[in-house]
Amino acid sequence: GEAMSIGRTFEESLLKALRSTEYDPAAYWAEVGDDELETRYLSRPTPDRTYAVFEAFERGYDVETVAELTGIKEWYLERYKRVTDSMAAAAAGEFTAAATAGVTNAEIATAADAAVDDVETAVPGRTYKQVDTCAGEFAAQTPYYYSSRKPEFYPGPLTDDAAAGELRVDRDVESVVVVGGGPIRIGQGVEFDYCSVHA
């Protein structure tokens, strides 16, 4: 299958895409030894390989070894490792890195053996950013938005980035938000949004 996602970081986008596939890896990693992990899951391009990469980092593999086994460029693998490292930090009670990486509050709570409510109060909520579909050439008539963690998580040029187009709602004007009933699939688009609001 395929998935498309948008986030402020590669990690966030990757995790959103993985969740949207609604795919559970076939392997029960506790039953898979290192040899099988390397020969069956890392060395072969299967739907489970992405999850096997996370498993390898959880087991302590380094980026260079995983790159050699998979043929995946180290830049990408470093981002996978950031997710794994952030989950280890979450298990120790530090939730910010995992939240920044795009891990859900429920997943963080599971890793930390904490209540979801405790995680939600410890990490800032989400904001909605506009995708500039016209690359600044002119105002977009059909703006798209994506959710992300609030900007205080992102140091540097992303903080207070007015060009990123944060969604603001004028409370004096009536408005409506259309929320889909399930994951959006590649091939669905504006025409389905149009049908939703005109149904």
Where are these regions (language model features)?
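ATP-dependent carboxylate/acyl-activation modules
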Residues: 1-199
